[in-house]
């Protein structure tokens, strides 16, 4: 590895991030944006010109933006003007969510076909740089590639407070996501008050977060909160699966005649209690169908109540009128002749992703192998499924990259495009794809600093971590076997298998049949090594994220043994010194869905302190693997590592 070149690239990255202005850091980046070199001076305030048809919510949002930058609102019409107008046509825009945003010497001019577009234009304006009450001149034409841009919250398994939900809704709105998929019924609990059957939400009927549920008033408050932010509230009543809480209370199977009667009562009460809701997800997945008439009958009943229905695919026997939410299988195209409507959620479960991998895979995603909305595909839903219990709700935001994932997904689904297939690691640094990701990473890191300083945001800059992968060495099934490279890691006589960039490197993905790792034809009973060098201006101890088998938050995975990083005998050496694994709180604990993770993942424990010397520091990661089967399906073999400075 060329030390001078590495250091030069590192300096370039640091310089470019520090000099990236908010003006260039819009997320999602608009479809068409043209900057001018000049600026508009707002130090003397602005005059407002607002159409009477503009909603009060948008007017208040505009006032909040101006007040946030201490820009006064003036009655004098001779100064700069900010105008909000709904127009019948707009060049380059054919979506109600699209907009035109122009800043010139006369002021700020926003036009849209509907109030949604005004709202999204203001979200773009909110991210503009108003330093010293000056803003750059720009001309924007923007609209989404997909009209359905969703985020799923699973509060059935792990309850979240109203304030926590509103925090996430606010982030959704700021990044132009427009559907909240609200999963509130589960095996562990039914979390919505029923006036007809109040015992359904009793503490004794819940196996986790006992008694925690949403009252009718709170549920309505969520609906209203979403509506005010142009977010469709999509509740899910999962039927007939994930219904153990229902069955504990009613003492019948949901698919039985009596069970159907009870669920219809609840559905009728739901429709009468929340008459403004017109969309309902009816579930249908992960259940043995004993009554083939259940789903057709329930679907027709739900539709008779005035709802458009959504269901999981694969799942039960859905009706043709039900929108299919795809969640299993590889990156396949939709059959254009199927005559059905789809949403994509395949490999969009962040609970199965490493935090750094989350941003990587979502940035490059092409939804259902399409670059934009089609007649059969209206969009996608990013899902957060914390199946495993958590000690406190905040843990969900550190164990999974909720906010980094949300805004990366928002970028991709608004802009469209992406690349065919799925990836878990970064492309080569000479490629255009890498440079596109690096540019986005600069934007997301600026947003982390500017907008998420007080919120959990498990992401670190990874485009400056350069690795040589060396191997494979045949370990003959002995994962502790040592090879010469451990004594002389930076000798010139080793064959470099591949140069790889990234903070998390997945050698072989545990879903290798659909997601490639960085090793093209991985072999069992192999050992690879990853080597790198890191510069330090002085001798000091610095924090690092170090990890190996990133445990899914949906499996009952076992905790590593004391003294081991993982079950593969992976090791880390810095300047020839072995870095010990953390002292685990629950070493060797057999996994269980009711046993919360505590420190097993690098993103939700204290960073590992590593002693660095002045100058270049040698990093060597040992990565042995035996077979690829894993102990069982709860403990798949995860041949991977994370090593990255923590800032």
Describe the role of every protein-language-model region.
Residues 328-464:
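Flexible, acidic glycine-rich loops studded with aromatic residues
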Residues 522-536, 604-608:
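Short beta-strands within extracellular/lumenal beta-sheet-rich domains
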